[in-house]
Swiss-Prot record:
Superkingdom of this protein's organism: Bacteria
Keyword Hydrolase: yes
Organism ancestry: Bacteria, Pseudomonadati, Pseudomonadota, Gammaproteobacteria, Enterobacterales
GO biological process, one term: nucleotide-excision repair
Name used for this protein in its record: Excinuclease cho
Coiled-coil residue windows: none
Source organism (scientific name): Shigella flexneri
């Protein structure tokens, strides 16, 4: 049997000769070079084929049109629409919301994860806690965000292996009182289970190892507005407990969006944590009595 290998050069040439679908040409000239979200629509008026985001909508859409692997989606597309935002943060937030709401055929599905959990470090043990039972935006000593209990315990086990922590003391396996664990005999546990290491030293190493996974508590009392600017547009992103409530054009409109979020939004946390805490954006605390304080 003769195997035919496709070289990178041939793949490049295939991409180079790929032509834009004729039926989409009329949409290309109007594509903006601004940040935002774009949608490829098929026959359905309610469910788009694909939703994407970029800091330059035109450039990103044209890169889709040059990719042979996306030919199937492009053949099904009947039109392209877009929504401009003031920057990358707005594009990321809007994309995540629209994908969840509209479930496009060619996007990776983003659904509300009802098994979302974290490791919570208590005085004597580590527990797996769930977002449906604990307010992850306010609860202290949470580490990691995991799709399910199994993933959380696997992460804890990996930390134990790296740091030679005791499975028994972490609750990962049974531990007979007064006896060393099996891993201690193999030099894979530093011996907190049998007195070779103090429980305090063990707990300190555990906390230090978990620190990189810490879930940051919401640092404000209520909602805030993050200001994002573009030469042609200014948006205020209204956020509470790491949940994006929406965007408005002025602070005067902010109170129309303020509400108590239901549950913890994993995607919102991932997108918003760094910019909100970076000090690079103007953040305004939103008071129900309309007393806004910029920081």
């Amino acid at each position: 049997m003769v195997r035919r290998l496709t070289s990178p050069r041939l793949e490049f040439e295939a991409a180079a000769i790929y032509e834009y679908p004729e039926h989409l040409h009329s949409f290309l000239n109007d594509l903006p070079t601004r940040p935002g979200v774009y949608l490829f629509h098929g026959e359905s008026d309610t469910m788009p084929l694909y939703i994407g985001k970029s800091v330059n909508i035109r450039s990103r859409v044209l890169s889709h049109l040059r990719t042979p692997d996306e030919a199937a989606m492009l053949r099904q597309s009947r039109r392209i629409s877009w929504i401009c935002t003031a920057g990358e943060i707005g594009a990321l937030l809007l994309e995540a919301r629209l994908i969840k709401e509209q479930q496009p055929l060619f996007n990776k599905r983003l659904r509300r994860n009802r098994q979302l959990c974290a490791l919570q470090l208590n005085e004597k043990r580590v527990d797996v806690v769930y977002a449906k039972e604990v307010d992850f935006s306010r609860a202290p000593n949470l580490f990691g965000l995991f799709a399910n209990r199994r993933a959380a315990l696997q992460a804890l086990q990996s930390i134990a292996d790296e740091q030679k922590l005791c499975y028994g003391l972490l609750g990962l396996e049974p531990l007979s009182r007064g006896r060393a664990c099996f891993r201690s005999a193999l030099k894979r546990c530093a011996g907190a289970c049998c007195g070779k290491e103090s429980h305090e030293e063990h707990a300190l190493r555990l906390r230090q190892s978990l620190e990189r996974l810490r879930v940051v508590c919401w640092p404000w009392q209520g909602a805030v507005a993050l200001k994002e600017q573009h030469p042609e547009m200014t948006q205020y992103h209204i956020i509470q407990n790491w949940l994006w409530l929406g965007a408005v054009n002025s602070l005067e409109e902010a109170t129309t969006l303020i509400r108590t979020p239901a549950g913890f939004d994993h995607d919102g946390y991932k997108i918003l944590c760094k910019p909100l805490l970076s000090g690079n954006y103007e953040i305004t605390e939103l008071d129900p009595a309309n007393d806004q304080r910029a920081s």
